[in-house]
Curated annotation (Swiss-Prot):
It comes from the Bacteria. This is Queuine tRNA-ribosyltransferase. Homodimer. Within each dimer, one monomer is responsible for RNA recognition and catalysis, while the other monomer binds to the replacement base PreQ1. Pathway: tRNA modification; tRNA-queuosine biosynthesis. Substrate binds at residues 96-100, 150, 193, 220. Binds 1 zinc ion per subunit. Its cofactor is Zn(2+). The keyword Oxidoreductase does not apply. GO terms for molecular function: metal ion binding; tRNA-guanosine(34) queuine transglycosylase activity. Pfam families: TGT. SUPFAM superfamilies: tRNA-guanine transglycosylase. Zn(2+) binds at residues 308, 310, 313, 339. GO terms for cellular component: cytosol.
Length: 380
């Protein structure tokens, strides 16, 4: 039996749902699950220091392979001693494969069996990313958890296209496993695709589970489908994945989606949402989203969220944060970003406690009622 560098330990199953409390052991420490992972695209979580991320309880962060491969280059990071030393982060790091960025950012991409040829979005130069190259770059980065190179088809692509795509993704996953130079200290996850088609998700899961990865990601969601469609895919996909390994739902950060994923047995999430909306002055609060830049808060001397105990809410008022944002002061973005990240990391801590107490469905109902979801704001 392979001794994987990434191990999942189940602590408790929730009585009334598929939710599970656990922990993931990595070469750079252990973190509890379910967990939300802040995204550090360019080897930094925008405006936040490693110390601040630790304060808020982030045991793992994500970095983007595509961006770091293009700039400053994976070989330079390897010379620095790997990503942990380069960015002074001594806890777990997960890297994606670069595939999603190739499909979403790059121009004029051409997908073949060998890989993807595309134009560098920074300078227009021609680039080629293959399963082997994606693994090689991540081996140089030295992340604790790596992703297989996959194609992320759009959710509403035709069935025949998605079928060919998942079959190619399975072949790419096998090639990536063979190219992996550091299986002793980097865990490589397989990525299940298949859009909204149950039989294709089943086929993709079967292919990848047979390859015995140390963990599995669910890709191809949060790409334009409805909340109900996402939940339906999770309902038939999560049970196909091994119970003794981590389950990671990629690119999901809306609070209700996090809770609904946990109910269905998901352990890990990542998303740029909390920092992206923070830069526009939008804050997640216990009572729903709050656009602190609005004129209504010019003389509001209460915290962004009176129920939040983060650094921002304990020390600064809505009026002050609004002033900073209106004056284009970076500190304002730091404060809103810290708050939003803390909100999601802390939400997962509350979810973990609800699993312990066997009252996750009640917790969900209370949260949704208070947050006030409706069609206009459900993405926040």
């Amino acid at each position: 039996m392979i001794d994987f560098p990434i191990k999942y330990r189940l602590i408790k199953k929730e009585k009334y749902t598929g939710a599970r409390l656990g922990e993931i052991i990595t070469p750079h420490g252990t973190f509890p699950t379910p967990m939300f992972m802040p995204v550090g695209t360019q080897a930094t979580v925008k405006t936040q220091s490693p110390e601040e991320l630790k304060q808020m309880g982030s045991g793992i962060i994500l970095a983007n392979t595509y961006h770091l491969w293009l700039r400053p280059g994976d070989e330079l990071i390897a010379k620095a001693g790997g990503l942990h030393k380069f960015m002074n982060w001594d806890q777990a790091i997960l890297t994606d494969s670069g595939g999603f960025q190739v499909y979403s950012l790059a121009e004029k991409r051409d997908i073949s069996e060998e890989g993807v040829t595309f134009k560098n979005h920074l300078n227009g130069s021609k680039m080629f990313l293959s399963p082997e190259k994606a693994i090689s770059v991540q081996n140089n980065l030295g992340s604790d958890i790596m992703m297989s190179f996959d194609e992320c088809p759009q959710f509403y692509q035709p069935y025949d296209y998605v079928k060919k795509s998942i079959e190619r993704t399975s072949r790419w996953a096998e090639r990536g496993l063979k190219a992996h130079r550091r299986p002793h200290d980097q865990g490589l996850f397989g990525i299940v695709q298949g859009a909204g088609f149950e039989d294709l998700r089943r086929q993709s899961s079967h292919d990848l589970v047979s390859m015995d990865f140390p963990g599995y990601s669910i890709g191809g969601l949060a790409v334009g489908e409805t909340h109900e469609e996402m939940n339906a895919v999770l309902d038939f996909t999560v049970p196909l994945l091994p119970e003794n390994k981590p389950r990671y739902l990629m690119g999901v950060g809306a609070p209700d989606s996090l809770i609904d994923g946990v109910i269905r047995g998901v352990d890990m999430y990542d998303c740029v949402l909390p920092t992206r909306i923070a830069r526009n002055g939008t804050c997640m609060t216990s009572n729903g989203r709050l656009v602190v830049k609005n004129a209504a808060y010019a003389e509001d001397f209460s915290p962004i969220d009176p129920e939040c105990d983060c650094y921002t809410c304990k020390n600064y008022t809505r009026a002050y944060v609004r002033h900073l944002l209106k004056a284009d002061e970076t500190f304002g973005i730091r404060l809103t970003s810290y708050h939003n990240l803390y909100f999601l990391v802390n939400l997962m801590a509350k979810v973990r406690q609800a699993i312990v107490d066997d009252n996750l469905l009640e917790f969900r109902q209370d949260f949704i009622e208070k947050y006030g979801y409706n069609a206009s704001n459900r993405n926040f």
